[in-house]
A protein has these predicted regions:
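Short alpha-helix capping/helix-loop boundary micro-motifs
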Residues: 74-79
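Hot-dog-fold acyl-thioester-processing enzymes
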Residues: 1-73
Length: 135
């Protein structure tokens, strides 16, 4: 426990990623795709959809901690800083707990805390996740 895994690479978010994701998920909040509206907010430009950030950081963590596993759920999702098109995001994951599954022989449950960091090393998202993995 306490082991920390870092994604091998980061991912620069494109404006198109954000626009396509908001269209795909039918998110109609103009803060994500209307530059004129976003200019009137405290951020002055469109924010990346936070569920895109969650999906991206989860994906960046898969190779290191859950490539053969099944996601059981997220908890304690926090968004301490905004994400914008052009930001490069990477993931760091710390193992919090490991135990054998009580209901599935041959499997274990790992609980991790993952943080997404931008190119300035600011934490932009943090969450806990439980994963079912073969032993």
């Amino acid at each position: 426990m306490g082991a920390v895994y870092r994604s091998r690479f980061g991912r620069t978010i494109l404006e198109a990623d954000n626009v396509w994701f908001t269209l795909l998920t039918l998110n109609t909040n103009p803060i994500h795709f209307d530059a004129e509206y976003a200019a009137t907010t405290e951020w002055e430009r469109p924010l990346v959809d936070s569920t895109f950030t969650l999906a991206l950081v989860t994906g960046l963590s898969v190779e290191a901690v859950s490539e053969r596993g099944v996601n059981l759920g997220w908890r304690e999702v926090r968004l301490p800083a905004p994400v914008f098109a052009g930001d490069t995001i990477r993931a760091e994951t710390e193992v919090l707990e490991k135990r054998e599954s009580k209901s599935r022989p041959g499997f274990g449950i790992v609980t991790v805390r993952t943080r997404g960091l931008n190119q300035r090393d600011e934490v932009v998202i943090e969450f806990e996740r439980s994963i079912l993995l073969p032993l």
